[in-house]
UniProtKB/Swiss-Prot annotation:
Sequence similarity: Belongs to the RecA family.
Keyword Membrane (UniProt): no
Gene name as annotated: recA
A GO molecular-function annotation: ATP-dependent DNA damage sensor activity
The keyword Cytoplasm belongs to this UniProt entry's keyword annotation: yes
Coiled-coil residues: none
First-listed, main subcellular location of the protein, grouped into a coarse class: cytoplasm
Positions contributing to ATP binding: 80-87
Protein name per Swiss-Prot or TrEMBL: Protein RecA
Pfam families: RecA, RecA_C
GO biological process, one term: DNA repair
Gene Ontology CC, one term: cytosol
Length: 350
């Protein structure tokens, strides 16, 4: 008798044999009708699924998400104020998916996609699928078709606020359209979520913030498109600018904070901070310096940074420059930080 049979017998101890027989018949019938895996015991080896993910392009955010990035087969929402880095973050996810040989698509409902900026962030423009739909229904049908194909790794919808229902487009200016978009999103996500969960795709919805009228207590901010996306999203990321980055008097980027507001695959409410530089995106060097100091790989004494016996320079910018110019040094620091992060992540996630 093999181990699997022994395990099954242990799990079935105490269950009425007649009930067990009826259960097995029901499971067989369901699998015949809907396919293998339609229903399974959570304790079975076949049911234990490792959460695969796609990197966000930020080591700190990947760490905060608990699974090394955005989980595949799930819906993610990235929201925040205007010009906070929502699209930049989504483009980094696309670039990371393409680096792994994946296929990515962007549904540009805002009709504002900038190919030259995406290229600077590492996106392969020639391989990227892009659609600029005329209505919300068309946009969400395109998303569903791409996901059901099973060939796409990342689909980005930019943005929920721009998903205008067909009825609103065909109506007159000033017509009452209360709840139309929320209803559209609710219907679409009911269909989409099942299709996405059976695929290896990450579906990212970029969303904007609006102010709720007449709110006296609590946050007056809310996202567009109703409550369906909040419910169906496995990951919700709140992205904000917290400071400007200056080179002398010139503003060259923003210090950005991302809070994991919702996480169904790991502990939520963690946050990540990193630099987004204009024309470059997430600053990998700046992030590595910050993490190296945090994990004790790089020592900071006053304003001086050092790695072992080697001085990297005075000030954060000098340390970044030293890592950028010495690839072997960069690799050493990166590997040590990565090992410490992975070890810490395993301890935290138990």
């Amino acid at each position: 008798m093999n181990m699997d049979t022994n395990d099954k017998e242990k799990k079935n101890e105490g269950i009425d044999p007649a009930k067990l027989k009826q259960l097995n018949l029901a499971v067989d019938a369901l699998e015949k009708q809907f396919g293998k895996g339609a229903i399974m015991r959570l304790g079975d080896g076949s049911a234990v699924m490792q959460v695969q993910s796609i990197s966000t392009g930020s080591m700190t955010l990947d760490f905060a998400l608990g699974v090394g990035g955005l989980p595949r087969g799930r819906v993610a929402e990235i929201y925040g104020p205007e010009s906070s880095g929502k699209t930049t973050l989504a483009l980094h996810v696309i670039a990371e998916a393409q680096k792994e040989g994946g296929i990515a698509a962007i549904v540009d409902a805002e009709h504002a996609f900038d190919p030259s900026y995406a290229r600077k962030l590492g996106v392969d423009i020639n391989a990227l699928l892009i659609s600029q739909p005329e209505s919300g229904e068309q946009a969400l049908t395109i998303v569903e078709t791409l996901v059901r194909s099973g060939a796409v790794d990342v689909v980005v919808v930019d943005s929920v606020a721009a998903l205008v229902p067909q009825a609103e487009l065909e109506g007159e200016m000033g017509d009452s359209v209360v709840g139309l978009q929320a209803r559209l999103m609710s219907q679409a996500l009911r269909k989409l979520t099942g299709a996405i969960s059976k695929s290896s795709a990450v579906c990212i919805f970029i969303n904007q913030l609006r102010d709720k009228i007449g709110v006296m207590y609590g946050s007056p901010e809310t996202t567009t498109g109703g409550k369906a996306l909040k419910f169906y999203a496995s990951i919700r990321l709140d992205i904000r600018k917290i400071a400007q980055i200056k080179d002398g008097d010139e503003i060259v980027g923003n210090r950005t904070k991302v809070k994991v507001v919702k996480n169904k695959v790991a502990p939520p409410f963690k946050s990540a901070e990193f630099d987004i530089l204009y024309g470059e995106g997430i600053s990998a060097m700046g992030e590595l310096v910050d993490l190296a100091v945090e994990f004790g790989v790089v020592k900071k004494s006053g304003s001086w940074f050092s790695f072992g016996q080697e001085k990297l320079g005075q000030g954060r910018e000098s340390a970044k420059k030293a890592l950028r110019e010495d690839h072997a040094l960069f690799q050493q620091v990166y590997i040590q930080v990565r090992e410490l992060m992975t070890g810490t992540a395993e301890i935290i996630n138990g």
